[in-house]
Amino acid sequence: MGLLCSRSRHHTEDTDENTQAAEIERRIEQEAKAEKHIRKLLLLGAGESGKSTIFKQIKLLFQTGFDEGELKSYVPVIHANVYQTIKLLHDGTKEFAQNETDSAKYMLSSESIAIGEKLSEIGGRLDYPRLTKDIAEGIETLWKDPAIQETCARGNELQVPDCTKYLMENLKRLSDINYIPTKEDVLYARVRTTGVVEIQFSPVGENKKSGEVYRLFDVGGQRNERRKWIHLFEGVTAVIFCAAISEYDQTLFEDEQKNRMMETKELFDWVLKQPCFEKTSFMLFLNKFDIFEKKVLDVPLNVCEWFRDYQPVSSGKQEIEHAYEFVKKKFEELYYQNTAPDRVDRVFKIYRTTALDQKLVKKTFKLVDETLRRRNLLEAGLL
């Protein structure tokens, strides 16, 4: 009797194990099948190109966005951005006051000098204190000093971030004791991407049957981060390359002798030459157009070596469009130097973008989705 019970128990255990093994195998097969239908997108670009802002927009647009815990995690980041920015402006003002022939306009008031020294010391720390109302009032006083405003106008020479004005105009709210960052604050927050981050989404919603599912990879743009891209190159459906077209008069954070636009040109050329991208589609985002359209009327495009042959033709909106089309053509020429014009297995599209403009980013990704779906249908012989 005991032997029969033992055999029955072993038989039941074997059956359970077989059932579990079959279930695991079924899940693995399902995941492998689902994985085949996920399109891989690689988000590339030099440092400060705005690609990480694009990445955050995708999370807001096509996923659940940021929960309260994630929003709160940006508080120290945003406060650090404030301290770093005001230190850059203060130290830059001191440098201009010492070295410029018209140094008088860079002379701080006695009140600003005292505030500035304290803030510069805080900005040089490894750990920043939480932004308080008292500190924010000091920062606001310093920010409004005419000498700081003169320095800010030369921000391209000092690595002053694009978010400076936004941060300074929101100091009161950012320093509130109960402050929780808004979605807009998170988009403006500057954190250098290190390593690789990824997100999975569908531009048409959660229902995977209604459209393509994409896995988007964002990688560090600074030079020392680029070696981490290599293992991501295989099996990519498309490269989304971000080029900050407003940065034609700026230098790299990591190499102040190198023009940012020249770095972007060389990086784009290098990526195009990679054998693993021979049949990969390229979506070029000419980003930061909002800054470009203001800057190009004041700072000649031909200050950049790549744009030496640019000739202005007009003023106002007409000149902005002329300058934009010139830059666009330069990138097109670079692409076709690396790709035969009659290639049909490699799609190339250019989009004018502003990473902070959510409506524009949404519209752009819908267009990218349509382009890639059409390519898939062509490859399948359905078009």
UniProtKB/Swiss-Prot annotation:
Phenotype seen when the gene is deleted: Hypersensitivity to ABA and glucose (Glc) during and after seed germination. Altered response to blue light (BL). Abnormal roots architecture; more auxin-induced lateral roots. Reduced H(2)O(2) concentration in melatonin-treated guard cells associated with impaired abscisic acid- (ABA) and melatonin-induced stomatal aperture.
Region span, G5 motif: 353-358
Organism, as annotated: Arabidopsis thaliana (Mouse-ear cress)
Region (G3 motif) residue spans: 214-223
Binding-site list for Mg(2+): 52, 193
GO molecular function, one term: G protein-coupled receptor binding
Chain's role: Exhibits a fast rate of basal nucleotide exchange. Guanine nucleotide-binding proteins (G proteins) are involved as modulators or transducers in various transmembrane signaling systems. Together with GCR1, may regulate the cell cycle via a signaling cascade that uses phosphatidylinositol-specific phospholipase C (PI-PLC) as an effector and inositol 1,4,5-trisphosphate (IP(3)) as a second messenger. Promotes abscisic acid (ABA) responses in guard cells. Involved in the blue light (BL) signaling.
Keyword Magnesium: yes
Region (G2 motif): 185-193
Keywords: Abscisic acid signaling pathway, Cell membrane, GTP-binding, Hydrolase, Lipoprotein, Magnesium, Membrane, Metal-binding, Myristate, Nucleotide-binding, Palmitate, Transducer
Domain of life: Eukaryota
Covalent lipidation (S-palmitoyl cysteine), chain numbering: 5
InterPro entries per record: Gprotein_alpha_su, GproteinA_insert, P-loop_NTPase, Plant_Gprotein_alpha
Positions of GTP binding: 48-53, 162, 187-188, 193, 221, 287-288, 290, 355
SUPFAM superfamilies the record matches: P-loop containing nucleoside triphosphate hydrolases, Transducin (alpha subunit), insertion domain
Region of interest (G4 motif), ranges: 283-290
Tissues and organs where the protein is expressed, per its UniProt entry: More abundant in roots and/or leaves.
Family membership noted in the UniProt record: Belongs to the G-alpha family.
Main location: membrane
Cofactor(s) needed: Mg(2+)
Localization: Cell membrane
Domain notes: The helical domain (68-188) is required for self-activation.
Domain G-alpha, chain residue ranges per copy: 37-383
Region feature (Disordered): 1-20
Name assigned to this protein: Guanine nucleotide-binding protein alpha-1 subunit
